[in-house]
């Protein structure tokens, strides 16, 4: 029997707000560059509104690319099947074989709060990447909210996830691990 269950990873209100603010900040240089280019190309005769410099053009290209890549690497959801737990992302999905999972449980309260981000993002489309926290050590987060999280422990790595219906997620995964 090939069971497969999908759990969404939806952004909470705080993440939605911070993502919106950062998106405006990242995309503003691209919009300004387009505006100045348009004004320069189609401005009134005899009026020279100026040209965007190479730095602004580079920034205008890099910042939207950063926004796209950050979104593409954010967790969209989690798939549990008979063989693997898959962290669904547009770029570089993460596969954790069920045979490597030693424990699944509700995450410690506030595990993400106060953590040191070693590599990844905190508050722009998610909380994902490599983190460290005193009393926890290094862990990998692939979450879209700060509460109702789940810890997945393998022999080498601790994962922190944010599936919808965390209790059901833990039960479904736990049942497969006991087989």
Regions found by a protein language model. Give the residues of each.
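Canonical hydrophobic alpha-helical transmembrane segment
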Residues: 53-68
């Amino acid at each position: 029997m090939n069971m497969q269950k999908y759990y969404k990873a939806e952004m909470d209100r705080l993440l939605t707000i911070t993502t919106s603010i950062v998106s405006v900040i990242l995309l503003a240089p691209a919009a300004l560059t387009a505006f100045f280019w348009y004004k320069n190309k189609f401005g009134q005769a005899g009026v020279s509104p100026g040209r965007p410099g190479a730095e602004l053009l580079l920034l205008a290209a890099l910042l939207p690319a950063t926004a796209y890549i950050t979104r593409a690497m954010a967790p969209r959801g989690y798939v549990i099947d008979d063989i693997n737990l898959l962290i669904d992302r547009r770029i570089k999905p993460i596969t954790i074989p069920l045979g490597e999972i030693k424990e699944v449980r509700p995450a410690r309260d506030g595990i993400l709060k106060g953590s040191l981000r070693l590599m990844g993002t905190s508050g722009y489309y998610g909380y994902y990447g490599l983190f460290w926290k005193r009393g926890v050590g290094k862990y990998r987060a692939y979450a879209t909210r700060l509460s109702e999280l789940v810890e997945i422990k393998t022999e080498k790595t601790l994962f922190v996830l944010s599936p919808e219906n965390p209790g059901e997620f833990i039960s479904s995964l736990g049942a497969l691990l006991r087989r």
